[in-house]
């Protein structure tokens, strides 16, 4: 276990005096209609939460946590789930809130929820009853905010959730292929809360309840606001331009000047006078009351290098112990982003997860099936945060790098509650995990390093010597959980960080012996150093060592178990040769992947910055700094995805064409070392048929009308010319003689 952290909050999450409405007590479900409010005896809601998800009263759903958290503070909280956004009417169904609207797109970004990585429309939505698509608008945060303002103009609107959190600054938008303004500016909301929102949400709610205008609440951590100038008392660091070397003064020569000769005259002692002792306050730390001025929205939109520079700064200002505020100009105003909130302590985490959740969907949905709930209803979240720092992932920017773990007792109590209260429980816990399965209770062993570190990852390129890799707390938790009465099996479905696991083989033995249901998910993401260095993922040496240990312990337990690796195609830094080598590795190890994923440029991720700018924000940025190869265009992205499914005959023509272009024709054939088979006679005939349907050779003598014809129209014209002029026309009767 690590020492006591130096990163401490000003006050405990549950130390605020309860609001007067606490006398109503907790609601069975947070109300979604006026009828439910009447049954609770409420005349109005203090806070109304608007969400793009169905309301499931479960701690895996953000709105349930926020709602129950505010309820525990004494506020009356209503929920408007998946409202009809075509008018303001649905946003008025609970009446006017006394304090504010809280708006979120849901547990997922609404654009990622609606579109695939190839920008194709999805036809389902796991967070909607019966998996129906189209129940939330594109850019739901913007739409919901506009309707809330239209319904009650004088009620403050506070944004939250993953969609708003990752769009708090100017950001690249993959779906429109442009840089967009901060969502706070576009939505005209009053405040944005990024990351896990318990601390800022509770503080802002209480301050509003005490009569403080939201325009004067400007100093809350984990919030972003619109300002006209920097907050008073803060000093700034200008980073609107790239870092340049300053002038270095020459070192003075110690013997450069002749000193005067010594004078041996006696010196009379000076009269000593008493001096007052001045007690100075403790010196301010260099990051306190300091902000960084980022390049403006207008600058980053027009200059990709400045965009990468701004992204690099933002990712280095995420440690709550030493992060500075950020300030970015948008037109004649600024987006002011306060430092991240202090992580929750174990006691606070326990209190949050002990709130009176029903752990089922709201009764208004009847027997409708909600796939996202079905997936997690028998799972337990044991921690938050991730210190892996993978470039393509935004969990670190949202939940933080410091792991926030629950106590063993809290987790055991939740397992018992699932066993005793959740309908349909069969004795199997589907997951004990979080963003990563094996980071429970792992933190920095040095409090001072934890407070001041600005590394993007604690495990890349190597595991930091300060990082605790002792998995004993996790092993003890697993053992205690599976010994509970009525529990048949504890499965681990969250991804295992194998480079940390190999540091403690006891964990791998425990996992392989008791907690794998035949297959275990891990994510090497790639095999080649080029893309792995951009992803900030370990090399295949760690994977090979983990596989060796996993296979050994599985054999000792008498079990036949397999690893299921996940890979990403078309990630920045991935060349065609890298994907061919990955495909050969897959074939060598007899992997045939069914589901493959092209890289999806989500807002705020470092990989998205690489995708848009072609620069590497993991190192110092400059106009001549290292560039990154980016596989763009539908054809190249299709090829990379096809190479992951080298065994699919539908992909063979595309792969053959690419191998021939790369000079790797020797990989086509029936030999063992070949990637795809040679084309069959029928395939070659079909290719010739397709080649015939092309444009004829043109010369300067070809008529202009013929030059402009497509193959289809040329074929039609030639067939028309071959027919008689009056073919198919009705024959006219001969004219009468003498007429």
From Swiss-Prot:
Residue ranges of every copy of the Radical SAM core domain listed in the record: 372-650
Disordered as annotated region, ranges: 685-739
Alphabetical keyword list: 4Fe-4S, Iron, Iron-sulfur, Metal-binding, S-adenosyl-L-methionine
Co-factor binding details: Binds 1 [4Fe-4S] cluster. The cluster is coordinated with 3 cysteines and an exchangeable S-adenosyl-L-methionine.
Record-given protein name: UPF0313 protein YgiQ
Keyword Electron transport: no
Gene3D superfamilies: tm_1862 like domain
Ranges of Basic residues composition bias in the record: 729-739
Organism listed in the record: Shigella flexneri
Matches recorded under PROSITE patterns: RADICAL_SAM
Biased composition (Polar residues): 704-724
Molecular function (Gene Ontology), one example: iron ion binding
Protein family (similarity comment): Belongs to the UPF0313 family.
Highest taxon of source: Bacteria
InterPro entries: Elp3/MiaA/NifB-like_rSAM (IPR006638), Methylthiotransferase_CS (IPR020612), rSAM (IPR007197), rSAM_horseshoe (IPR023404), UPF0313 (IPR022946), UPF0313_C (IPR024560), UPF0313_N (IPR013704)
Cofactors named for this entry: [4Fe-4S] cluster
Keyword Metal-binding: yes
HAMAP family linked to this entry: UPF0313
Residues that coordinate or bind [4Fe-4S] cluster: 386, 390, 393
């Amino acid at each position: 276990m690590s020492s006591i952290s130096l990163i401490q909050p000003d006050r405990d999450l549950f130390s605020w005096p309860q609001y007067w409405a606490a006398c109503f007590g907790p609601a069975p479900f947070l109300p979604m209609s006026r009828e439910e409010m009447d049954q609770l005896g409420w005349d109005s809601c203090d806070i109304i939460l608007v969400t793009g998800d169905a309301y499931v009263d479960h701690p895996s759903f953000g709105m349930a946590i926020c709602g129950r958290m505010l309820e525990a503070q004494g506020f009356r909280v209503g929920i408007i789930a998946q409202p009809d956004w075509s008018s303001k009417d649905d946003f008025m169904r609970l009446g006017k809130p006394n304090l504010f609207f809280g708006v979120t797109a849901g547990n997922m970004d609404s654009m990622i929820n609606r579109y695939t990585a190839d920008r194709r429309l999805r036809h389902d939505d796991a967070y909607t009853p019966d998996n129906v698509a189209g129940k939330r608008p594109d850019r739901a945060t913007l739409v919901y905010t506009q309707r809330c303002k239209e319904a009650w103009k004088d009620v403050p609107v506070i944004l939250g959730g993953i969609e708003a959190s990752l769009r708090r600054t100017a950001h690249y938008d993959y779906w429109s292929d442009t840089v967009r303004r901060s969502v706070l500016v576009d939505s005209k909301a009053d405040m944005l809360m990024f990351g896990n929102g318990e601390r800022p949400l509770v503080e802002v709610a209480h301050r509003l309840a005490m009569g403080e205008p939201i325009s004067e609440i400007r100093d809350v951590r984990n919030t972003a606001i619109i300002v006209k100038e920097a907050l008073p008392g803060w000093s700034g660091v200008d980073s609107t331009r790239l870092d340049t070397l300053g002038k270095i003064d020459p070192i003075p020569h110690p013997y450069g000047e002749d000193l005067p000769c010594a004078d041996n005259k006696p010196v009379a002692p000076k009269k000593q006078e008493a001096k007052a002792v001045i007690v100075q306050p403790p010196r301010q730390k260099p990051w306190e009351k300091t902000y960084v001025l980022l390049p403006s929205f207008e600058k980053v939109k027009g200059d990709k290098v400045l965009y990468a520079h701004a992204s690099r700064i933002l990712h280095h200002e995420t440690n709550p112990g030493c992060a500075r505020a950020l300030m970015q100009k948008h037109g004649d105003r600024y987006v002011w982003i306060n430092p991240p909130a202090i992580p929750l302590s174990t006691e606070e985490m326990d209190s949050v997860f002990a709130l009176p959740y029903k752990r089922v969907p709201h009764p208004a949905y009847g027997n409708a099936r909600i796939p996202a709930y079905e997936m997690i209803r028998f799972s337990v979240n044991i921690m938050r945060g991730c210190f892996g720092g993978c470039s393509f992932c935004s969990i670190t920017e949202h939940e933080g790098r410091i792991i926030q773990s629950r106590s063993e007792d809290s987790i055991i109590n939740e397992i018992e509650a699932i066993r005793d209260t959740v309908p349909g429980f069969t004795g199997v816990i589907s997951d004990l995990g979080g963003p990563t399965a094996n980071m429970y209770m792992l933190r920095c062993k040095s409090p001072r390093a934890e407070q001041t570190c600005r590394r993007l990852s604690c495990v890349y390129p190597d595991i930091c010597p300060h990082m605790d890799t002792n998995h004993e707390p996790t092993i003890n938790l697993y053992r205690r959980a599976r010994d509970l009465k009525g529990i048949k099996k504890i499965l681990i479905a969250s991804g295992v960080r194998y480079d940390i696991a190999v540091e403690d083989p006891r964990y791998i033995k425990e996992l392989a012996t008791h907690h794998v249901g035949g297959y275990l998910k891990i994510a090497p993401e790639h095999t080649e150093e080029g893309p792995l260095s951009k992803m900030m993922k370990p090399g295949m040496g760690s994977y090979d060592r983990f596989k060796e240990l996993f296979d050994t312990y599985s054999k000792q337990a008498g079990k036949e178990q397999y690893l299921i690796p996940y890979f990403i195609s078309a990630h920045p830094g991935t060349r065609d040769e890298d994907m061919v080598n990955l495909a050969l590795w897959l074939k060598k190890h007899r992997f045939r992947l069914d589901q493959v994923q092209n890289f999806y440029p989500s807002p705020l991720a470092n990989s998205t910055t690489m995708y848009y700018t072609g620069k590497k924000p993991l190192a110092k940025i400059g106009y001549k700094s290292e560039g990154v190869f980016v596989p763009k265009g539908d054809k190249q992205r299709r090829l990379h995805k096809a190479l992951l499914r080298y065994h699919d005959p539908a992909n063979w023509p595309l792969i053959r064409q690419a191998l021939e272009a790369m000079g790797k024709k020797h990989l086509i054939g029936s030999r063992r070392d070949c990637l795809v088979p040679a084309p069959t006679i029928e395939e070659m005939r079909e290719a010739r048929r397709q080649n015939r349907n092309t444009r004829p050779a043109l010369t300067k003598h070809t008529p202009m009308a013929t030059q402009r014809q497509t193959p289809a129209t040329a074929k039609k014209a030639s067939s028309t010319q071959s027919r008689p002029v009056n073919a198919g026309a009705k024959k006219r009767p001969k004219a009468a003689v003498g007429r």
